[in-house]
Amino acid sequence: MLDIAINHIEELKKAMTRTWFQEKYKFYNYDEYYRDLNIEDETWNVHQFVSLDKDGNVIGYIDYSVNRQTYNCSNLGIINFSDNKIIFGMDVGQVLRDIFEKFKFNKLAFSVVIGNPIEKSYDKMISKYGGRIVGIYEKETKLIDGEYYDVKLYEITRESYLESKK
């Protein structure tokens, strides 16, 4: 179940800091540096959500930036703190539906560090919703293992998303 992140600040921040320096989460962080998660008290520039299990525990976090001038979304962040892929996956799907159907944003652009286990799922999602792989930045980011990684860029337009739903 989705809820706004501001309602779960303490539990969410604890879950996020537990991921610091963990090999399993190195791709989410996208960097060698960690900082405390900033939960905004407004939704003008960013939408922030938590995924909750049936008992109301935070099992994941989903956010994206909003450009109000272009009505485009970017910087999609998705992290699952649990092994509950079913509920979390349904919540990610709800966020995608909301971006294009509820909020009627124009486009979603996001990226993934190549090698991240979620990359294949993103490729399938892009194909399912009529999006595209925009390109690849070579050696774009350095992770906690000291290695440089390529980054794949994606985009889905509202038009292609709605067309895929027919």
Q: Where are the regions that the model predicts?
A:
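Helix-loop element at the rim of GNAT/NAT acetyltransferase active sites that forms part
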Residues: 14-31
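Active-site rim helix/loop that mediates acceptor-substrate recognition in acyltransferases
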Residues: 26-49, 53
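Acyl-donor (CoA/ACP) binding surface of acyl/acetyltransferases
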Residues: 1-16, 48-166
